A protein has these predicted regions:
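Structural preference for solvent-exposed beta-strand-turn elements
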Residues: 1-212
Length: 212
């Protein structure tokens, strides 16, 4: 059995934030949050295979790696926790598959859930060295909101670039072939030009005013 401790409120906030990307899916994993505790950090990941959200918070104790089975139930349970949240993770083998359970305990409250093997969760893409950058979520979100009206709505006939917001230098702009909207982010320099679908950028609101 592995045992680790995190701050309950911080954990609940992070779970709530990244789970906004989850939606009903035929692939069970894509409705769940994956958890990895390693080197004193708890990393939570959620994805729909187009957008990836991760959040990190301090943790103490043993390493563990799994994906929740009922993220929505975990969110409800965590909303009642405060103080130190203890996670006790155990797994057994059933044929070639690992079967795991996690017990969440906070003072006198507790709940046990079945979990998936974390090794089966989709791997998070890693940015190439030099491609990562930091920016205020609030500033970026405000900038995107000022230009995204000029991006075309996603459709079968839409050109990929037309449904995206584009980033280059310190400029943020959208162009659907008829309209052009442009804004700048002073003090920010994007490592190289890239595009992101305008509807996906709505998830920026989940980060609030934090840097990312």
């Amino acid at each position: 059995m592995s045992r680790a401790v995190v701050d309950a409120k911080e954990f609940s906030h992070a779970m709530s934030k990244i789970s906004k990307v989850l939606k009903k899916c035929a692939i069970p994993f894509l409705e769940e949050v994956c958890l990895r505790i390693q080197n004193g950090r708890c990393t939570l990941t959620a994805t729909d295979l187009e957008t990836w959200f991760t959040a990190e918070l301090p943790a103490s104790g043993d390493d563990m790696f799994f994906a929740f089975r009922k993220t929505k139930d975990i969110l409800r349970a965590c909303s009642h926790f405060a103080g130190e949240l203890t996670m006790e993770f155990s797994e057994t083998r059933s044929g070639s598959k690992k079967v795991g359970k996690v017990l969440l305990r906070c003072e006198r409250r507790g709940a046990e859930f079945e979990v998936y093997d974390g090794a089966d969760y989709p791997n998070t893409p890693q940015a190439s060295e030099g491609d990562a950058f930091s920016v205020s979520s609030a500033r970026l979100s405000a900038c995107v909101e000022r230009v995204r009206y000029a991006a075309e709505k996603p459709s079968v006939s839409a050109r990929p670039a037309a449904i995206c917001v584009q980033f280059c230098g310190n400029s943020v702009y959208a162009l659907d072939g008829t309209r052009l909207a442009c804004d700048t982010l002073e003090g920010v320099s994007f490592p190289k030009p890239f595009l992101v679908r305008a509807d996906v950028l709505a998830h920026l609101s989940a980060f609030g005013k934090e840097d990312m």
